[in-house]
Amino acid sequence: KTKKPNCIIIKPLAFEKMLCYNTVVLLKLQRKVNVMKNTLKKYLSLSIACALLISMIGCGTTSAPAETVPATESVTEQAAETVTETASAEETAAEEAIEAAETTYPVTLTDQAGREVTLEAEPETIVSGYYIPSSLLIALGLKDKMVGIEAKADKRAIYKLAAPDLIELPSVGTAKEFDLEGCAALSPDLVILPLKLKDAAASLTELGIPVLLVNPESQELLTEMIELVSTATNTQERANELLSYMASQKTMLSDILADVEPESVYLAGNSSLLSTAGPAMYQSSMIELAGGKNAAEEITDTYWAEISYEQLLAWDPAYIILASDADYTVDDVLNDENLKDCTAVKNGQVYQIPGDVEALDSPVPASILASVWLAGILHPEQVPADTYTTESNTYYETFYGISFEN
């Protein structure tokens, strides 16, 4: 019988994941484009060279004739040339991507209301009337360009921790009571508002102030908002780092939870236990990514829907998850006599989404961390509990400059 060669097999999928996760680490440690480019080049060259050498040396039999050595050396030389050519191609592609990512002004963009908005020059002063893009602007490194912000900024921990000066900025009100005159008086180069403020956007546009309307109410729309705002402000490089991190976490969860049985999850809103999010809302995709199934999947409302105790008991979820800013507590739910027969309550599976830095169940860029946290609750064997803590620390230190000791 012919002796089987001793082979070392590198699975393509595992190799791909390794490159993906290491890219995220590189993005965190190397923010300068030239450093990141050279690091990736060396990493790619070393990885390909190692893979080729392992496959040639590991798969060679002990009975191979000595005459094959020159051929191996020739192949190695060819492989080295290929590595060099590949690295050079990667370098060129990176440079072209960076050049293409820079915004050339004037630029005309289509916002999330379908409006065409033209910016004559890179914005130097920005007003955000919505906390979701406000958080994004900090992550994009634009906090020093902000001259106005939504009401109640002093209530948001993320501002106190990452950009305390924002708390002192003039308030432009809320979506319900927007201060149009106050916003216009700031003479900003760019204003970012929620979709529901279409009328205010029209009024500001008539005054010659560019306004972007955003509506990040799904994973796809959140990504679209990040791309829109970063293009408008010429911060695509930073946005790409942020999107790469988000994508790496989605990939991690999707791969790890691919074979799990989804758990039934009821998400309770801020104002009431009997207020919940249907499948049209961002929070539903957050549950699904964590390996859960939205108990309210039959609801057709596009906003928070009100239900009854009878309906909640009929769904009988395995888990009840409270919104991070809920006006009631986990103990309130566990001690609610109306829910004594609910599986989640009987088993003590009632939790609240973390909100000590910002509301992770809202469509902020950090909302990917809510899925990581929830996955640790629903599937602790696949996603250890400390995964959320580790990723949360990494995310906020990388994009907000916040370092947590505990």
Regions found by a protein language model. Name each.
Residues 172-175, 180-193, 209, 308-325:
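Proline-aspartate-enriched helix->loop->beta-strand connector
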Residues 8-9, 14-23, 28-32:
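Short, positively charged and aromatic/hydrophobic N-terminal segments
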